[in-house]
Amino acid sequence: MLDLGLSKMALIGVVALVVLGPERLPRVARTAGALFGRAQRYINDVKAEVSREIELDALRTMKTDFESAARNVETTIHDNLREHEKELNDTWHSAVGGLNEAAGDAGSTGSDTAAPSWRGSTAALAPKRRNWRVKQAAAPAWYKRATTRRTHVQSGAARVARHQPASLRRPTRFF
């Protein structure tokens, strides 16, 4: 940048003293120092912002790399699952086809009787319909209290008076 040694700075100070005079020199020096400080702060802010942007850019690239790796893993898993599912379906269909042929050779006329015996037991495994009343009764009491309509409505002043300690209440006078 600037190559200012001690001798050059002393020369600039002497010239400034001669040109500006002793009355205005301190004020000009303060102003110059303040401007120099502002310039340094501005440069430091710019440096910090540039370094933050560089870090953010590095984080963005790491994020995209991670997302692409996750997508690759996901597609690999899905492909493997589809492949195994296809193999299982092919095996299942070949086994069911063999059962249907055997049942057809035995003289069955309907396709309903050719179904495997385990299909009849699926009705027992079907999920039962849930009772609506049981679900309604499962709500906590505090929730029921908070959501129901209020039957005893009080004004704000009455509510404050109701919950105010006895020591803070005004004494009541009866005439």
From Swiss-Prot:
List GO terms (cellular component aspect): TAT protein transport complex
Annotated membrane topology is: Single-pass membrane protein
Where is region (Disordered) located? 155-175
**Chief localization class?**
membrane
**Gene Ontology terms for molecular function:** protein transmembrane transporter activity
The organism sits in which domain of life? Bacteria
Name where it's found: Cell inner membrane
Q: Which residues cross the membrane?
A: 1-21
PANTHER family the record matches: SEC-INDEPENDENT PROTEIN TRANSLOCASE PROTEIN TATA, CHLOROPLASTIC (PTHR33162:SF1)
Which HAMAP family does this UniProt record tie to the protein?
A: TatB
**What the protein does?**
Part of the twin-arginine translocation (Tat) system that transports large folded proteins containing a characteristic twin-arginine motif in their signal peptide across membranes. Together with TatC, TatB is part of a receptor directly interacting with Tat signal peptides. TatB may form an oligomeric binding site that transiently accommodates folded Tat precursor proteins before their translocation.
Give the family, as the similarity comment puts it.
Belongs to the TatB family.
Q: How the protein assembles, per its UniProt entry?
A: The Tat system comprises two distinct complexes: a TatABC complex, containing multiple copies of TatA, TatB and TatC subunits, and a separate TatA complex, containing only TatA subunits. Substrates initially bind to the TatABC complex, which probably triggers association of the separate TatA complex to form the active translocon.
In terms of NCBIfam families, this protein maps to: tatB (TIGR01410)
Q: What name has this protein been given in UniProt? A: Sec-independent protein translocase protein TatB
Q: Which organism is it from?
A: Burkholderia lata (strain ATCC 17760 / DSM 23089 / LMG 22485 / NCIMB 9086 / R18194 / 383)
Q: Supply the source organism's classification.
A: Bacteria, Pseudomonadati, Pseudomonadota, Betaproteobacteria, Burkholderiales
Encoding gene, per UniProt annotation: tatB
